[in-house]
Amino acid sequence: MKNQQVRELTVMAVIAALYVALCYAFAFMSYGLIQFRVAEILLILTFYNKKYCAAVILGTFIANMLNGPYDMLLGTLATVLVLLIVLLIKNGTVKKIIIAPAAAVINGVVIGLMLYYIFEIPEALLVCMIDVAIGEFAVVLLGVLIFAGIEKTNPKVIDIIKSIGANIRRPQNKI
């Protein structure tokens, strides 16, 4: 039992760290008015196992430290709202595509308002919202398509993703 909990915690830490690393590696396009936050692709993991929600939320919170307390609070809130929708949507590629516009609207509104009012970005409020929404839509849709491709070409990868913390037996080569 303890080994399984350690394995789960380790996987969660790796996902949170990957989210942060992707944001920082692509910081030039992960923050600001025009955002293509590649790390948002990790939202799709939560379709396969709801336990990944905590890792994505933690990763978002840590990554948003770069932008200060408002982004830590509001950016993380936007992620929580998107993940609540994910939890309501059942599996299936067509249903997963719904998350792209939902994430775009939520992030467009929340982050757009934050950029306009708190960070005082001089563009019009609607421009702030639309710019953020376009990037979010593109990245999340890309994530849905990537994972749909993985499901078709290598479903065992998806089985591993679904079975976080499970005792997965790997085939051993017998010589």
Question: At which residue positions do the language-model features occur?
Answer:
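Short alpha-helical scaffolding segments that buttress acidic/His motifs in well-ordered protein cores
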Residues: A17, L58, A100-A103
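Membrane-embedded alpha-helical hairpins and interfacial helices in multi-pass inner-membrane proteins
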Residues: A27-L33, M65-I175
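Interfacial segments of multi-pass membrane proteins
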Residues: F47-N49, F61-N67
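Hydrophobic transmembrane alpha-helices
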Residues: M1-A54
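Hydrophobic, membrane-inserted alpha-helices
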Residues: A39-L42, A55-A63, L81-I85
